[in-house]
Amino acid sequence: MSHKKIVEFEPYSKGLLSKVNRQGEVTNYDYDSNNRLSEIRIDGKHTQQFTYDHLDRIVKLVENIKNEKSYTAETSYDVFGRIKKETYPDGYAINNSYDSYGNLISVTDSYDNKIWQGLSANARGQLTKTKQGNVEKTQFYDSRGLPSSISAAAIMNMAYTFNNKGNLISRSDLLTGHKEDFTYDAMNRLTAWNISKDNISQASNSIDYNPTTGTITTKSDVGFTFGYGEENGKPHALTSLSGKPDRIPNLTQTVTYTDFKKVKNISLGSKSLVLDYGVDEQRRKGIFKDGSATFTRYYSGNYEEEVDSSGKVKKIHYISGGDGLAGIYINDDGNNRFYSTYCDYQGSLLALTDMNGVVKERYAYDPWGNRRNPASWKDTETRTKFIVDRGYTLHEHLDGFGLINMNGRVYDPLLGMFLSPDPYVQAPGNWLNYNRYGYCYGTPLLYTDPSGETAWLIPVIIGAVIGAYTGGTIANDGQYNPAKWDYSSGKTWGYMYGGAVAGGISGATGWAITGSGMPMANTAAIAGSSLTNSAYTGGQTPV
């Protein structure tokens, strides 16, 4: 059976794209008198309308989703072109303040709450002390700029140790006494992780790989052998397990896909999820069902709205500071709550607190992203509902299915692989890239996957959009357009790496959630998307 899809492109009179016809679904592109994109629409499904200022910056974005919801987000800038104010669709707003060097030093909201403050930084420009609500957070780094500890009162106190290759060899929760030690093979792939508490061994885990294909052959928490390519299947596509793990329900899970290869439907027993995508092929609506219970989630930039079957509306606002996600403001059917967010070095959510640091919910994950009991790392998570569904590297957990939606693709943290292949071979010189179902080259503690299609080094290293961009420009002889950079050159990646370390801004936390309509998705993503997309398409971007 052919899997080819016919896509027709119709140019505008001035050489600009006018229409894209994908199997009868037409995406229309309109432009203003200055040839700026003014509207993208799929009739009856999704529309985006853009308003610009005199410097061609987007100041207003209006979205219509399925003719059911209309959202307007606005952005204003100061005289230096920095984002001064961001207004969410329901009128809630955040304000940014900067020092004389252009560093973000504070984020406040419509109610004058001090959400985030930058207090001090080291010589590299990495933030060492910040304040979230009324609580100070301290971060220390080793001589290479890698994180050695992150602490905040009685909320979190994490310690990290990296080897000379940059791989994490241990992490410790000094509040609970937990420690996890890691070992790697010659390809830097994780091979074992062992948990102890108060120096007493709790659990040992291991994983093995096929030496030819790089696929996982066994994983101790699964407990059975992985089979690939059976019945003329693809050599990297999982086709069987030699038994049924206890953590997998005795039900058939069915997944269907759109013609652009993103998950459309998931069903498991009485549970189901139906996703709708917008003009940018990012999810805009999800209908979640569990038996008779139903709720709908709409996604629009750094704002989400949940509507349950009784019509109650939960409005979720994600707010970024200078070192990633800083807070979440929730209006739950008129009841307002604000949470400060505390994340690990990869941007995974560890705790939600009130403004005074009182912990409301804690979270923990194994190296592959499985939820586990924060009070007992050897045990799996038993809770089924959380204040927010964001967690591992700030992606959206689909807890009813045991999956994580990583924007471009859906990931199974128990199996340690994606459900579908990566559309890109990111680094053709690295043979591990040809296992396109694999997660982060088998090195989940060094990389994150913000888009579900591209692995990035840990956020604290290459998170700085500005630093990485500057380094890439230098490496390519002053070429300012990242679409024209040589991504096959080690010099490009090396200079981007160095520039990001010097920049010291962990903006990859924002990148991790850009594709899903999360923090930084509306404004900073506009600045960063050219760099990001060029990186994972080898410079072949449509703009």
Features from the language model and the residues they span:
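Short, cationic motifs built from Arg/Lys/His that form the positively charged side of catalytic pockets
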Residues: 189, 282-283, 407-409, 417
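Short, low-complexity export/processing leader segments characterized by acidic and small residues
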Residues: 352, 370-375, 409-419, 423, ...
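Extended, hydrophobic alpha-helical membrane-active domains that insert into or remodel lipid bilayers
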Residues: 451-543
